From Swiss-Prot:
UniProt family annotation: Belongs to the Clp1 family. Clp1 subfamily.
Compartments reported by the entry: Nucleus
Chief subcellular location: nucleus
Protein name: Protein CLP1 homolog
PANTHER family: CLEAVAGE/POLYADENYLATION FACTOR IA SUBUNIT CLP1P, POLYRIBONUCLEOTIDE 5'-HYDROXYL-KINASE CLP1
Source organism: Brugia malayi
Amino acid sequence: MESGKSPLEENLQEFTLKEDSELRFEVANGDVMLELVDGRAEVFGTELIQHKKYVFPAGSRVAVFTWKKAVVELVGKTESAYVAEQTPMIIYLNTHAALEQLREHAESVVMQQEQARGPSLMIVGPTDVGKTTVCRILCNYAVRVGRTPIFVDLDVGQGSISVPGTVGALYIEKTADVVEGFDKKAPLVYHFGNLSPGSNIPLYDLLVKQLAEAISKRRKSSQDATYGGVIINTCGWVKGEGYACLVNAAEEFEVDVVIVLDHERLYNELQRDLPSFVKILHQPKSGGVENRSKEVRISSRNAFVHKYFYGTRAMPLYPHTFELSFDEVQFCKIGCERLPIECLPFGMKVDDHRTKVVPIEPSEDLVHHLVSLSMCTAVDQSVLTTNVMGFIVITAVDMEREKLTVLSPQPYPLPSKILILSEVTFIDDKERT
């Protein structure tokens, strides 16, 4: 005899959360719907609205936290779902309060001190300690007290502002959507073209410097940005050259505060190597953070690129596929083969080959590669330090007809003819008519 319940209703779970506790759940296959039935609660710093239904797709990992108490319902199949009574949220709230004090101090001394500005905070730590989540919480808390912080993501492998292989910044004017995250309508994005800083450290350091300078100009031109401060996410590579990249980023962004998540050695090394005026804090990671396998990381990157072109079920996008003639575009890449010292042009440094912009000819090797659309009008060194306007994927190359087929967020023609090759690939498996 049938129960008469839908498959979703068969999987209904209700949780009563005590003060300072959180419900942690991971979505299995299919969707899970979250509803706040009673009380007050938040997801990564964004408040939930009572009786609004939030639908999370497969693979989502979510923490629903309450400062007082709450009753929440989950409908759908979860991989896991449990209530944790020990969380680091009070630590993150205290961090937010300290940052807000620094913002208020900057406002109060602006009449006497022209250089007063809100805090620049950098969050560091190895992979899988929850750096991106802490950034999201602190940005959301800042917005909830009327601030407009700038969020910077220097993680080229698992970034949350744009597609993999980029660094970028986002002006945060409203709290993140509970399911979709921050509004990414107008990010400032630079092309790196690889998934690890180690593939081209001179280029990575140069882009960090460029991004820091662009943000400094933005802060000088806007009072809200000046006082709102900067919150910086970083890569999980914390040893050797990766550590040097972190120190360089701290210097370029002139950070005031560094939070080290769950890594005592890194905390001690930064205490030794950063200026004494930088406040360095060691904080625990959340117990809800789990180590991600290589396969999960690859899947996460592919999902991010897929979302860029296709959106989500709640907010779908409809990309375009069309052909381009070879002569309609100019391809280039950053970095070339190292020449022997005796063959270098006069004045060129040995490292310069890593940051040289070189034109390339279309070939079948381009298939499945992401390509950045530069705002430049010619292939020259300005491509290196100019932000990009968007991305396409090369889905086919016909050498006989001299035609490319591309997946693009907008219809023909492309807004730029200067295309920068990325080593990041994406296989578009959607069939469109």
